[in-house]
Curated annotation (Swiss-Prot):
Signal peptide: 1-15
Species annotation: Scolopendra morsitans (Tanzanian blue ringleg centipede)
Listed name of the protein: U-scoloptoxin(11)-Sm7a
Taxonomic superkingdom: Eukaryota
Keywords of this entry: Disulfide bond, Secreted, Signal, Toxin
Location within or outside the cell: Secreted
A GO CC term assigned to this protein in UniProt: extracellular region
Amino acid sequence: MYLFLMINYFVLANSFDFQGYSMNARNEKSKQKRSSSETDYVCISNDYCAFLQKNTQNLYTLPICKCPGDNECPLTWDPDDGRTLIQGDIHFKFCSSAPVGLKQCGSDDIAYTAMWNKNLKTNTSEFTGEVFCECPKEVTHFLMKTKNEEGIEGQAYKCPKLQTCTSEEICVHIYNYTNNFFEIKYCKCPDGQSCPDELNSAAETDVKKERIRYGMKCK
C-alpha cells in the first residue's frame, strides 16, 4: 500500500490536474516497496509515521517513516494512546501527539497529503505527511492529485462518504501482499445485502507477482 505529501501544500494542491484514483488503484509496485516492517524514510517532524487497518482478514501495518530522535512510531492497535488519529477505517499513527480538534472533512476537502523527498544535501530519504481534517467513519480513500519531480513525489487524498453500491460495482477490494491483507472500500451494500469477506466468494480475482487482488460484490 502506497499512500500520501507536502512541498508547499497550496502550491502542490493547485499545480496539477485532478486525477481520480483510489489509494490502491495506482502505484502498486511503489506501495509494495513500503509494505514491509521497515522503512528507509525519515519523518521530518511530528508527521504520521504509520498506517494500521484492522480488516476482515488481519491487522495490516504499514510503517511509513522513522521518527526523529528517540521517538518510535507506535505500531500497536491502540486508539487511545494519544498518538492515533482515526481516518475512516485506517488508524494514522504519529511520532508524538496526534492532532486534535480537526474539522470533519467534506466530500471535496483534501483530507491528508504526503511527500517523499530525497534530500541531496544530507543524502537522506525524507517523508512529510500532513492531515487537514478528520474523515467520517464510512469513507473511501481517494487519490485526488499527484505530482512527481526529480527526487520528489507528492500525493493528496480526500475521503468522500461511501455511497450505495449498484449491482455491478465492486464494494471492496481485498489485497493480499504475501498474507498481509489490506482492504479498500468503494461503496456500501443496499439494505438486505452485505459485502462478502470470504476470498472464495470474490466476483473477480487479479493476480500479479507482488499481490493478489480480490474484488467483492454485494450479495
